[in-house]
Amino acid sequence: MSAYSTNEMMTVAAARRLKNGAVCFVGIGLPSKAANLARLTSSPDVVLIYESGPIGAKPTVLPLSIGDGELAETADTVVPTGEIFRYWLQGGRIDVGFLGAAQVDRFGNINTTVIGDYNKPKVRLPGAGGAPEIAGSAKEVLIILKQSHRTFVDKLAFITSVGHGEGGDHRKQLGLPGKGPVAIITDLCIMEPEAGSNEFIVTSLHPGVTREQVIENTGWAIRFAEQVKETAAPTEVELEALRALEARTAAAHGQQGGEE
């Protein structure tokens, strides 16, 4: 088996979570990479939807933004943005929302707005886009991001997109449909919400990763499932498809290849 990077492991693990035939509302960046890898490997019939209106997008290279022409040119059809949100998302037709994050907390709430005080921020982040609506209305949500003390924090400075709120049935109390976040996939592990509390716990460690590494890179006292699995390493097919996608993207956008 070929050697692989932690970022490749993360992308492959996230792609595997996307079931064949699912209708997936995709975020730009890591979610788009994982979703398109799924389309090219284990889930060829997945329907990828982007905020700008493409339905059934099949890009040959990864889009730079939701307005990338590649999405519209390769889609089955393109509809107005309002229809994406009213008919598809709020109408309960999105099986999976695939989101990234700047920061996430133990209940899968996402911050993509600001680091520090809102009025005097240390960092002003890109903002919400359609993520709050996706997090609120998709039948389930997958979150993908690299893991560190800076990204996995005990308390968010700002909740951009609600996951499980304050835990337990708080999401239901807020009147939000769907399951909310069902998995957080990182470069170290996979986390899933604990039954009852909806606090995210580690259910799978990637090959070679220790519990200590996860603990050191989490801003709260992370807990582990009773039975923690080892994530299956990427296959040659998965790595070949991912690297080819990255190479095509780099060539198309005049970038040097590969990792984000």
UniProtKB/Swiss-Prot annotation:
The keyword Transferase applies. The keyword Repressor does not apply. Keywords: Aromatic hydrocarbons catabolism, Transferase. It is an enzyme of class 2 (transferase). It holds the Pfam family CoA_trans. Its EC number is 2.8.3.6. Optimum pH is 8.4. The active site is at E51. InterPro entries: CoA_trans_fam_I, NagB/RpiA_transferase-like. Heterotetramer composed of 2 A and 2 B subunits. This is 3-oxoadipate CoA-transferase subunit B. It comes from Pseudomonas knackmussii (strain DSM 6978 / CCUG 54928 / LMG 23759 / B13). The lineage of its organism: Bacteria, Pseudomonadati, Pseudomonadota, Gammaproteobacteria, Pseudomonadales.
